[in-house]
Amino acid sequence: MPTEYYIPASAIKALELLRAHGVQMRKTTVATKGLEQFAITANTQRPATNSIDTGSHGLRSLDGTWAATDVTAPIGSFAVAMNQKLARLAFYLLEPKSDDGLTAWNYLDDVLATEGVKSYPILRKK
């Protein structure tokens, strides 16, 4: 499990959902290096269906891998420490391959629905 996740300040819907669930975050005051980034190899948006599981919602799924990156989390990002009471919930919501997380429920579609996007917008520290 990572020690922290870094969420861009522009991911307003995702940040609001994390706050609503009680996940603790802090706004960063320095740029953070030594992170991992998820490289997307497949990005699939399922068509909306009217099912008991998803309502009339089309779930998104990603495939890819985490790898060390030179990308820096800028000042003003939101850090989610994974030594908190709700770490498991945070992990489930923030991991790109989670079947019921922010990606699946389209909370990051401002970035992920863009043609040709190659990287998950949330970074993590091992």
Predicted features and spans:
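Intrinsic-disorder/low-complexity accessory segments
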Residues: M1-K126
